[in-house]
Amino acid sequence: MFSVKKRQHVNSPTLRTHRLIVKLLFLFILTTLALSACHEKEEHLFLSLDSISQISDESMLVSEESLREAIHHMVMADSDRDVAAMQTRRHYLNGGAIRWMTRDGVSAKADSLVAYLERVEQVGISPKLFYASQIKDDLERVRSLNFGEGKNSVSRVYGRLEYLLTKAFLRYTEGQRFGFVNPREVLNRLDVRDSDSVRTTYRQLYDVPTKRPGKDYVALAFGVMGSDDASVAKFLRESEPKNPLYATLVRHLSDPLSKADLQRLQTNIERSRWDHGDYPQNHSKYVLINIPSVHLLAVNGEERMTMRIGIGSLKTKTPLLNSRVKRMDFNPQWVIPKSIVKTSIRHHAGSRAYFDSHNYFIINRNTGKQVDPSTVSADMLMSKDYGVVQRGGVGNALGRVVFRFDNNFSIYMHDTSNPGVFSQRDRSVSHGCIRVARPYDLAVFMLSKKDEAMMERMRYSMTIDYRPSHTRGNDDESEKQKESIDKKKMLGSLNVNPQVPIFISYYTLYPDQNGTLVPYPDVYGYDNVIYNSLKGYLASGQ
């Protein structure tokens, strides 16, 4: 154990003598601590120095046991449920290594952390979350030997510092690096898919690859805490958000904003913290769909093309995801989802006229053969053994071209047989897929080279009066149609090579091509959900 004499008059020689003794003792003790810091558990961090205990007041003695006891007191008093708090508690409950002490007392790396904590309000986050004032006060007590009794006793101060520095370090670096709100938790528990007395399942609305602080990251963070000041400072710098949009948004926190505008800004800043590992700006060619804007942006180097789109309705929201456009299908057939069969088609079971008028046919999934619509019941239509398909060509709901990309929702971008939707202000009209207003232009964009011959084939395939016959047998009209089609020009599928990255995102505040931030309506209500989870982290008044 080591001793610290109670504070005397500032000019007292006795005080100066005891301060020197304490510093020498603390240097010796913490040198021993530093040598053992490579171990995750230490049984004797502070040496017992009974031979000099007579120079000390009992209330000013600190030992490893009393330090651990003080840390344990902090653990038991901490009821926070965020990830950083639980990681901190787990570390010390398991006897984890002391991280912030050096041969000189408290490491200078604590000052590096405090420097970041003092600036968190500039990025809209509350300093109270990181105990900045308490840490600064305790650092001053340690460096001036201004200890007292009770909560400010030497052991309580050191225990509190150790615990709060660790918790603040984890909370800051994880919050900035990964976001303070987990989007998968808040966005994937909104729309109920199915509910019964046993459990409730939800529709997945957010499927963007998003990193979270896992075991490897936590181990790295604790390793850095036990390292030197330069390593801590570097780790703090590298924890800043990687999304280029983050810095753009943060700059506007000092603008005079209404309460609603400030909340919108803070919510989008939080979105920009989420670490997706990949961003549109990483690519020279990409497609960006920002759902609230109800527009598509296609970028190829310096070339930019925008177009209106239709998105999923409130009941069938377009999911958020990243992928790559890999193929274009011309005059595609539409395999109609069971959800649409249930709501729009099943009550027409048995009506051949209805199926013929919509260019629908029914297929037996087991045999692969078409089935006469007049022989099919509503229950058969809803079973897994039968499917309803719309023939490709003029009048198909998917239009004349579909843009395919891998995802977990069977969604895609496509043309439409109802272009009037693009003149509407509210274009939340689909079952989740994305309708594009200029499908031919988007198809040309997907080409790696502007091949005139290929462009002509695409134009021909998308404009020829292609109407597959829905009647049994071949009448004169269908025969004439077949003869009029130039099969050499008709395209079926065309691979996109190289594949084009596509980002389906959700920002209600996003810069235009001139860098001006443009607000968009919160079409799916995600802002409120995110803000309600975020507001506990925000600086006063925000």
Predicted regions and their residues:
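Well-ordered beta-sheet/strand-loop patches within structured domains
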Residues: 2, 38-86, 170, 190, ...
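Intrinsically disordered or highly flexible coil/loop and linker segments, enriched in small
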Residues: 34, 175-182, 334, 452
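Cationic-aromatic interfacial patches
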Residues: 39-194
